[in-house]
């Protein structure tokens, strides 16, 4: 009896944050494992929208997740500085947009700003309706 491996009929299950695992501790209470938050599911959804028949390795997903975290950190940091310069205690869409223009180069910044504006408009219209 030889078991043949058949090609997967559907996409492999995406990596999701680990569920909270419970193990009884010394005093009888169950301890929960902290969940690790990643952008993996969102990256996977975008990949499937743009290239439906393409997969992604765990290593590549990890690299992209680090990249998104890094860009997020840079934009948040720059937006925070901008808010402080203007003596504001709140980061608004304006600070985020300016931070994106300062951090991302040329054409990439233009596209990011237009997509961001579109997303904010879509969100605003959905919450008012």
Curated annotation (Swiss-Prot):
Annotated keywords: Acetylation, Chromosome, DNA-binding, Isopeptide bond, Nucleosome core, Nucleus, Phosphoprotein, Ubl conjugation
Coiled coil (residue ranges): none
Main localization (coarse): nucleus
GO cellular component labels: extracellular region; fungal biofilm matrix; nucleosome; nucleus
InterPro entries: Histone-fold, Histone_H2A/H2B/H3, Histone_H2B, HISTONE_H2B_site
Cross-link Glycyl lysine isopeptide (Lys-Gly) (interchain with G-Cter in ubiquitin): residue positions: 122
Crosslink position(s): Glycyl lysine isopeptide (Lys-Gly) (interchain with G-Cter in SUMO): 5-6, 15-16
Entry PTM: Monoubiquitinated by the UBC2-BRE1 complex to form H2BK123ub1. H2BK123ub1 gives a specific tag for epigenetic transcriptional activation and is also prerequisite for H3K4me and H3K79me formation. H2BK123ub1 also modulates the formation of double-strand breaks during meiosis and is a prerequisite for DNA-damage checkpoint activation.
Name of protein: Histone H2B.1
